[in-house]
Amino acid sequence: MSTNQIILTDQGDNYVNVWSHVAQDLYNHYGETLYNSWFSKVNFIESSLNTVILCAPTNFVRDWIKSKYSMVILQLFQHYNNTIKSIEIITKELPGTTQTVIELPTKTFADIGSSELNSENIFSTLDVRFTFDNFVVGAPNELAYAAARAVAESSGAVSESNPLFLYGGVGLGKTHLMHAIGWYIKQNNPSRKVIYMSAEKFMYQFVKALRNKEVISFKEKFRSVDVLMIDDIQFICGKDSTQEEFFHTFNTLIDNNRQMVISCDRSPSDLDNIEDRIKSRLGWGLVADVHSTTYELRLGILESKIEQMNVKIPKDVIDFLASKIVSNVRELEGALNKVIAHSNFTLKEITLENTQNILRDLLRSNERIITVEDIQKKVASRYNIKLSDMSSSRRLREVARPRQIAMYLSKALTPKSLADIGKKFGKKDHTTVMHAIKKVEELLENDIELREEINLLMKILQN
C-alpha cells in the first residue's frame, strides 16, 4: 500500500480513521493486485447521517465496486463502528468538503539511477502508454491482468504462472500487459534483466546470428535473462529452425527458474504447424484468455482515456462509441482520438451528430449506420403500408401497429432520443414514442410470432 494516497477531510475524523483500517483490511484480504485495481484510488469524502460517502475515480470503478464489493466494505466499516448503516459511492466530490492529501513515498523512474537505466535496458522497446496504472480491468481480462501483475511483482522469484501464456484477438490488451510487466520490473527491480520482443524479431535476429556466425552470442543473450517476453508467438508456426532455437531457449530458461511470458492470437492447443513438444510446453503454466470487450469495459476504457487526456466528451457520445466500436480496444481508442483531433483542428464542438459523421467510414466497416428513415422504409415495405403512414396520425390497427414497431426498432437500433424519434414520425412528442415502445414490449412477452418478426427485421436492418 506504499504507493497509495490517504485522503482526509475536515469533517468526520473518526470515520477517516475507520476508512484507513478498512482500506488496510481490503488490501490484506484481496492482495495487492486487486487492491491496486479497484480500491487504491477510492477516497473518503465525508459522513452524513450514519452514511459513509466514498469517491471513486470513474463511473466504471464506482459501478464495479458497487456490484462486487459494496457489502464487504459496509461490513468492514461496521466492524469498526456499528453506527454506520450504509455506504454511498460517488464519482464527484461533494461541495463544502476540503481534502488534505497525505502522499506516501513512491518510487518513480526518476529515482532509478542513470547507470541502471543504461545497462542493457528495454525502455527503447516499451511503449510508455502501456502500464498497469492505465490498464482498465473488467470481466474479459481480469485473469490475464491478475496473472501479469503476479509475474511483475514476483520480486526475482519465479511466479506460479510460468510460462504465462496470454491469448486473444487483436487489440484486446495482450501487448499492453506485456509492456506493463516490463515497466513494472524495471521500475521496482532494475537489476533484473528483461527482454521483450516480437516473435518476428526473434526470428530475424536468429537468422542474422546464423548468417554472421554469432549463434553463441545469440544464445547467451536470450538464455541469460531473468524474464523473456515473446509477443505473437504464432509467427514462428511453420518455421522449423526458429522453433528449434525457441524450444531450447524455453527449456534453458524454465530449467533455470527464469520467467517466460508469451502472447498469441489463439490458445496453445489451436496452434498449427508447430511442434507438439513446444505446444505442450506453452501450456505448462497459466494460460489466460483475453476475451472480447463488453459494453461496460469499453465504457470504462473510454472514461479512463478521457480522464487521462483531460477533455470533456458528452455522455451520449461516450455511450455511442462504447456501443458501436466493438471490435477491439485499439480501434475504440483510435476512434476517440479521431473525434478529439477533429474537434481540436476544426474548433467544432464534439456532438453525437459530428461524431457519427467523423466516424462514418469506420462505422460502415464495422456495421452499417441504421437511420430512422431506414427502419421506416423497411417496416412499411414489410407490412405493405405507405411510407407516408409512418408520419400520419391514422389509428387503424394495420397502420398503427407497424408504426409502433418502427418506433420500437428506432429506439433499439439508433442512438436517437425519444424526442428525436418522435419528430421523424410526424412530429409526435416523446410520450407517444414511449407509449409505442411500451406497447410493443408488452406484446413481445407473450406473442412469439411478433418476437420472431421483430428479430427478423433487426437482422435485415443490421445486415
Swiss-Prot record:
Residues 125-343 are annotated as: Domain III, AAA+ region. Keywords: ATP-binding, Cytoplasm, DNA replication, DNA-binding, Lipid-binding, Nucleotide-binding. The keyword Nucleotide-binding applies. It holds the Pfam family DnaA_N. GO terms for cellular component: cytoplasm; plasma membrane. Gene3D superfamilies: 1.10.1750.10, 1.10.8.60, 3.30.300.180, P-loop containing nucleotide triphosphate hydrolases. One of its GO terms (biological process) is regulation of DNA replication. GO terms for molecular function: ATP binding; ATP hydrolysis activity; DNA replication origin binding; lipid binding. It is found in: Cytoplasm. PROSITE patterns: DNAA (PS01008). Residues 83-124 are annotated as: Domain II. InterPro entries: AAA+_ATPase, Chromosome_initiator_DnaA, Chromosome_initiator_DnaA-like, Chromosome_initiator_DnaA_CS, DnaA_C, DnaA_dom, DnaA_N_dom, DnaA_N_sf. Residues 1-83 are annotated as: Domain I, interacts with DnaA modulators. SUPFAM superfamilies: P-loop containing nucleoside triphosphate hydrolases, TrpR-like. ATP binds at G171, G173, K174, T175. Disulfide bonds: none annotated. Residues 344-463 are annotated as: Domain IV, binds dsDNA. The keyword Electron transport does not apply. Its main location: cytoplasm. HAMAP family: DnaA_bact. Oligomerizes as a right-handed, spiral filament on DNA at oriC. Belongs to the DnaA family. NCBIfam families: DnaA. Plays an essential role in the initiation and regulation of chromosomal replication. ATP-DnaA binds to the origin of replication (oriC) to initiate formation of the DNA replication initiation complex once per cell cycle. Binds the DnaA box (a 9 base pair repeat at the origin) and separates the double-stranded (ds)DNA. Forms a right-handed helical filament on oriC DNA; dsDNA binds to the exterior of the filament while single-stranded (ss)DNA is stabiized in the filament's interior. This is Chromosomal replication initiator protein DnaA. It comes from Rickettsia felis (strain ATCC VR-1525 / URRWXCal2) (Rickettsia azadi). The lineage of its organism: Bacteria, Pseudomonadati, Pseudomonadota, Alphaproteobacteria, Rickettsiales.
